[in-house]
Amino acid sequence: MKFLVLIGDGMGDYPLPGLDGKTTLEAAETPHMDYVAANGKGGTAQTIPESMQPGSDVANIELMGYDTTRTFTGRAVFEALSMGHHLGADDVAFRANLVTLEDGRMKDYSAGHITTEEASELIARIDEKLGTETLRFYPGVSYRHLMVWSGGTDAMETLPPHDIIGQVYGPYLPKGKRAGKLRSIMRDSEAVLADSLINRKRIASGKLPATSLWLWGQGRSLRMTTIEEKYGLKGGVISAVDLIKGIGVAAGLKPIFVPGATGYVDTNYLGKAEAALKALDTMDFVYVHVEAPDEAGHNGDVAMKIKAIEDFDAKIVGTVLGGLKGRTDTAVLVTCDHRTPIEKRTHTREPVPFAYTGPGIVKDGMEVFSERGAESGSYHILTAHHLLDTFIGEFIKL
């Protein structure tokens, strides 16, 4: 038996007056996710434990079957794994966002969704100017990068920049033991970036500049039981972002590269779906993650989020279901990792909908895939790290 997990990052939302009280998920045309819901089982899952901050890190670790209250140390650890950096015992990894600060406020958490090519040059410049034997900077995708501090500490309080969009950022700078070091790095990065030709060109073309690094998400290396060890399934992970690929690596999944996967609304949806179907030739489990709905939620853009959800439905879920026609050896789970409501522009902890279908399944009362539609499902899972057990256990004996 083979298993596909399809994640629309941040698809969940709140009812909006401008959509006649519907959520963006309810307003979107999603016939393929509705098919899964109407021809399988579903319900709601609590992806964010009460003690954890809402985020894609915590939520996706839970969805891969791990209790984050026992295994989570910080998202940057997983991003380091994805980039091929195996942390030493004294290393602490930090997510390093390129952001836009303006008039003392967090104007944009992504520096206007700066391109990977532009960002790579900026991070290389920062590493040249600020890097030392114990402090190194590594480029990632778009605005998402990595800092590794050898001999550093993770005993400090940091905050994601997407949680403070439009707010005065001073009160949210790193706090705690040796946090002054981080604040100094962030301040020094401003001087390096201010002298950048890339930023001057971005400003001239009406784009937001990258004015600073923002450090957060710190953590140390860890060891997780792999999905193959737990379920006897060899698998892969498909995502544009290092966080998800790194969680997959920690779970023993092989990252599958897809050309044109950007981590934004212009991503190569079809390429991801086709790569997932092809991977089933040699793998038993494939985890497919699409970032686009989450980015639209952070932007507070209703039309963009509806479009991202519809693209996920048509080009990911629809392509997968079409490719599986005639097969009786594959089950499909569709869900989102958390909600990124338009009105909040950040992650929240409410339960998310899920639905799955596969050979021989007896359907329940769920008819449509949405936040409210999921209330008719047969499962309401209080801890999402049990969801994978529920899904896989429906088709094979665990």
PLM ranges: what are they?
Residues 1-398:
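Feature captures the catalytic ectodomains and active-site-proximal regions of enzymes
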